[in-house]
């Protein structure tokens, strides 16, 4: 029998590497345990109302009295300053009193904690952001459930002929760390995704085939009808719960405190701020959901509902909108009527008065001619259609009879049936242009109409393009592409993007990318929806991303302008001295208190 082979190593059964790791962990643990405790944070003076800080604070010479320390940030503020900021009424017996303890009790909450004005604001801001985040998250989940979208995301769009490898961000690529000027298009969560399936390569070497049974055809009897699957009430539960949370925050942190502060509302005995907020939020959410359901179908209900929540929240949060808050909290305004009000009606009185002022100025500036309209007269020649001329001496040109016979094709407001009294009204198309301030002879008006279909909020707008100019392009390049970039005028919606992000993007590429600017003027029949879209975009502080139609086009954005204010992007493109060949002419803009602009980013090197 052979002898077994034995090892003579003294370290048999031991792993030196693991031993070293174990010793390192023990040493690190001992260091953490024996680490000296941190020193107490140095006390800091920071009183925002009076501007007192450590740099200018002298304890013996301070004229504002005693201080109190915040339990969250450990900074010190004057008691009198905080009483004024928080608008706390001081009892008569404590006026001009030096009793610091009694005055301090007026600033503490039910938990005997005092928080400065900055900490309270940050807390409210965090709560508001959390509510917005939950609402957006539930909106995405609700849309996926309702629209029965596929779980996988759509493939990225890649232009093979583009050297810069343009792509449109999907949800999976929205947080890529590398920043490129093509990444500033945000896909909207509400878009219905296409179910793209990858094809499997065929293998000619495989001779055997597998038979796949055919699906049986669906048979519908006479007493059955094929209908769409309508979502149940449970599918809306998530988004409605988050909306109620936002409304509770709205009443608790903004409406009730502001009305109490201005003595226009009193809390009845047996009730508190929380119970009142819960009651109003539940009733208001129920009315709002019923209203949104009545004006939309089940596919667009979630998007319409969430946008309406945001509009109500932002307007009722406005400190200048005290009259609306008073009407709501005192039930002077019915909640059913409140949820059906437009963004313009919900705006604070200052904005509404400004709008009325602008409208009145436009009416006052309208000039109506005193002279009667020019008519046609017939010459004394034997031929009725020999020649016609204007009676106004400023018009001396004689028209050819052929021009009069072609009046229908040229949209001229005259007929030839009865030359003496044949003046007719202008066609509807000319009326719509005149009503909107569109000059048909303006060379900057493109000969193609735009059509914008924003189906997510059921807004479809039709109108005309007015070219404003470009940057970084010479005259030949501009003349070559200024009409080609819009193609047939159909603007294909891709997604929304925050205005701040779009402005930062334009600031980054303003010296390397050319930008063409247009004003979008609505037709008369679409003006109402056009203004609704402007208000909708302004409330969200968003721009709309359009799908590029040409290989040299990088991005297309639609901007909104309310009360005649020029968007920040156009201000950058017209005032920045670092931009070469600035050819954008703001004098071409039609004066409207609500208007839309289109900016097109192109690559000048491949134009």
UniProtKB/Swiss-Prot annotation:
Any single Gene Ontology cellular-component annotation: nucleus
Biased composition annotated in UniProt, kind: Low complexity: 388-399
UniProt biased composition (Basic and acidic residues): 374-387
Biased composition (Polar residues): 407-424
Pfam families found in the cross-reference section: TFIIS_M (PF07500)
Stretches that traverse the bilayer: none
Compartment(s) where it occurs, according to its Swiss-Prot or TrEMBL record: Nucleus
Main function: Negative regulator of transcription elongation.
Residue stretches making up the TFIIS central domain: 239-374
PANTHER family: IP08861P-RELATED (PTHR11477:SF0), TRANSCRIPTION FACTOR S-II ZINC FINGER DOMAIN-CONTAINING PROTEIN (PTHR11477)
Alphabetical keyword list: Metal-binding, Nucleus, Repressor, Transcription, Transcription regulation, Zinc, Zinc-finger
Xref: PROSITE patterns: TFIIS_CENTRAL (PS51321), ZF_PHD_1 (PS01359), ZF_PHD_2 (PS50016)
GO molecular function terms noted in the UniProt entry: RNA polymerase II transcription regulatory region sequence-specific DNA binding; zinc ion binding
Top-level division of the source organism's lineage: Eukaryota
SMART domains: PHD, TFS2M
Protein name in the entry: Transcription factor BYE1
Zinc finger (PHD-type): 44-122
Region (Disordered) location: 180-210, 369-440
Keyword Transcription regulation: yes
InterPro entries documented for this protein: TFIIS_cen_dom, TFIIS_cen_dom_sf, Zinc_finger_PHD-type_CS, Znf_FYVE_PHD, Znf_PHD, Znf_PHD-finger, Znf_RING/FYVE/PHD
Biological process per Gene Ontology, one example term: DNA-templated transcription
Organism placement in taxonomy: Eukaryota, Fungi, Dikarya, Ascomycota, Saccharomycotina
Chief location of this protein within or outside the cell: nucleus
Family: Belongs to the BYE1 family.
């Amino acid at each position: 029998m052979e002898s077994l082979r034995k090892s003579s190593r003294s370290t048999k059964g031991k792993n030196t590497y693991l031993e070293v790791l174990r010793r390192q962990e023990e040493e690190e643990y001992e260091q953490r345990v024996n680490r000296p405790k941190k020193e107490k944070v140095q006390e800091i003076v920071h009183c925002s109302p009076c501007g007192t800080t450590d740099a200018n604070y002298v304890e013996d010479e301070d004229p504002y009295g005693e201080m109190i320390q915040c339990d969250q940030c450990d900074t010190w503020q004057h008691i009198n300053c905080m009483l004024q900021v928080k608008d706390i009424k001081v009892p008569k017996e404590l006026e001009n009193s030096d009793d610091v303890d009694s005055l301090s009790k007026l600033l503490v909450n039910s938990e005997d904690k005092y928080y400065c004005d900055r900490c309270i604001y940050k807390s409210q801001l965090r709560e508001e952001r959390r509510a917005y985040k939950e609402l957006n998250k539930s909106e995405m989940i609700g849309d996926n459930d309702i629209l029965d979208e596929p779980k996988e995301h759509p493939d990225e769009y890649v232009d093979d002929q583009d050297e810069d490898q343009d792509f449109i961000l999907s949800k999976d690529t929205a947080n890529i760390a590398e920043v490129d000027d093509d990444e500033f298009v945000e896909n909207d969560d509400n878009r219905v995704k296409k179910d793209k399936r990858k094809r499997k390569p065929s293998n000619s070497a495989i001779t055997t085939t597998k038979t796949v049974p055919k699906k049986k055809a669906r048979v519908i009897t006479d007493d059955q009808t094929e209908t769409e699957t309508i979502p149940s009430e449970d599918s809306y539960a998530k988004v409605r719960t988050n909306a109620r949370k936002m409304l509770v925050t709205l009443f608790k942190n903004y409406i009730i405190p502001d009305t109490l502060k201005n003595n226009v509302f009193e809390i009845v005995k047996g009730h508190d701020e929380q119970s009142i907020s819960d009651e109003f939020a539940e009733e208001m959410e129920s009315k709002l959901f019923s209203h949104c359901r009545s004006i939309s179908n089940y596919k667009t209900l979630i998007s319409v509902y969430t946008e309406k929540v945001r509009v109500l929240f932002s307007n009722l949060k406005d400190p200048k909108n005290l009259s609306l808050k008073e009407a709501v909290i005192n039930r002077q305004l019915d909640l059913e009527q409140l949820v059906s009000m437009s963004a313009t009606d919900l705006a604070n009185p200052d904005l509404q008065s400004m709008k009325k002022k602008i409208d009145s100025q436009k009416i006052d500036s309208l000039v109506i001619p005193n002279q009667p309209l020019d008519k046609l007269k017939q010459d004394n020649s034997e031929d009725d259609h020999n020649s016609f001329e204007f009676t106004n001496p400023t018009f001396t040109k004689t028209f050819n009879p052929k021009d009069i016979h072609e009046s229908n094709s040229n949209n001229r407001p005259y007929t030839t049936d009865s030359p003496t009294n044949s003046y007719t009204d202008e066609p509807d198309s000319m009326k719509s242009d005149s009503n909107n301030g569109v000059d048909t002879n303006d060379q900057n008006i493109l000969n193609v109409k735009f059509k914008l279909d924003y189906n997510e909020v059921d807004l479809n707008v039709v109108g005309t393009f007015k070219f404003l100019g470009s940057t970084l392009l010479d005259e030949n390049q501009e003349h070559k592409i200024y009409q080609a970039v819009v193609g047939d005028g159909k603007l294909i919606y891709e997604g929304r993007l925050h205005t701040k992000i779009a402005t930062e993007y334009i600031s980054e590429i303003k010296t390397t990318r050319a930008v063409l600017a247009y004003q979008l003027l609505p037709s008369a029949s679409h003006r109402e929806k056009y203004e609704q879209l402007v208000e909708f975009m302004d409330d969200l502080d968003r721009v709309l991303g359009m799908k590029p139609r040409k290989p040299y086009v990088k991005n297309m954005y639609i901007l909104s302008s309310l009360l005649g204010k020029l968007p920040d992007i156009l201000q950058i493109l017209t005032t920045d001295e670092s931009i070469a060949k600035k050819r954008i002419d703001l004098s071409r803009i039609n004066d409207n208190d609500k208007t839309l602009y289109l900016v097109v980013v192109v690559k000048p090197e491949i134009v």
